[in-house]
Amino acid sequence: MVRNCLSIVLAAGEGTRMKSPLPKVLHKIAGLPLVCHVIKQIELAGSLQLAVVVGSGAEDITKVVQSFTKNAMIFEQKERLGTAHAVLSARLALQEEVDDILIVFGDTPLIEHSSLVRIRAFLADGADVVVAGFYASDPTGYGRLIKKNGKLITIVEEKDASDEEKKVSLCNGGIMALNGKYALSLLNKIDNNNMQQEYYLTDVVSIASRQNLNIQVVEIPFDNVIGINNCFELFEADALWQKRKARDLMLSGVTILKPESVYFSYDTEIEPGVLIEPNVYFGPGVKIQSGAVIRAFSYLEGAVVGRDAQIGPYARLRFGTELERSVKVGNFCEIKQAKVGEFSKINHLSYIGDTEIGTNTNIGAGAITCNYDGFNKHKTVIDDDVFIGSNSVLVAPLSIGKGSYIASGSVITEDVPINSMVFGRARQVIKEDRAIKLRAHLSKNKRNK
């Protein structure tokens, strides 16, 4: 029997320690907001119902979440009265009949769907409350999971823990799952009789224990529950994410010569057999096919690189770039909104924008397309087997026919028929010995000043 699941993502925290006008959960690692990382893993874990509780920065968070997933129900926590109060802000969703309720914090971007699947499996096996825990060599600062006779009976925060309880190394990971049958009744029993006068989600455990419900602890890796509270922790989490991504790629058959110097985005796709040299940046939307070589100091975003292509060093591929098989893009080239056919070469010092290039075409050093007139972008179409000489300027809109040859230094403003040779430059004029007279004239003028 397939169990349905409601996941509640708590994203209402103010995040004051970030010291940023941007809501905490909208800060990014690998190019994706923290809360979207969490939602992605929740969906991969098979949870089809999603409630996101927002507070500070509600409008901005709502916009980002709804653009990322169409499944999200948004609920606002109007007062900051604790984590249980935040969960109950989604009361309308909780009132629906669901088997599993999964509660996750929106600032834990390193959670893996495999951990969430394991947590849900305990509910399927009969647990009523499941708490994610981890063992810490130094548990200072973390809530402790306190057991009695092998059973979890309560979660004690560090500030409230006795000396004996502080010796416990099993810590609260923050993620909790509830049997839908008991969820609302447990949450409704939580009170705010504490120093902070807040409603704590962790009190669910002691309430469930008193009711003799089945409470289980699932041990998950510490990095899965790392929360982000400041920009340094954001950096550390990003570094961990990058290390995971590089490891997964290398185990799949991608060669990365210096993985710590390469930056990947959340959706980077690289096939086995690709070679990546040091200091490469992959922005969102990049796909690299097998056999391609990405040389050092290249910057790619929104680009598809075909089989056996060679990129860089020092190349920039921008959004809308599609390179087919065995294309070469060399040093100090920028490609944007361009489709380049197989075996074509753009080897050095070129800007190619809003362009279609056919197969086996060569773009010489320093050749550029002029695609913008100050108001609108215009397209250049270059057919198969074309040679564009060095330092040529192609002024769009423009079409260059198959097999044509553009002489170096030309400025091309009109369409070129197939198999044409085009000169678009002024004729060279030679005046012998004129340089001697010119130098004498210039030298005299300089002395007179």
UniProtKB/Swiss-Prot annotation:
GO terms for molecular function: glucosamine-1-phosphate N-acetyltransferase activity; magnesium ion binding; UDP-N-acetylglucosamine diphosphorylase activity. It is an enzyme of class 2 (transferase). It is found in: Cytoplasm. It holds the Pfam family NTP_transf_3. It comes from the Bacteria. The keyword Transmembrane helix does not apply. This is Bifunctional protein GlmU. It comes from Bartonella bacilliformis (strain ATCC 35685 / KC583 / Herrer 020/F12,63).
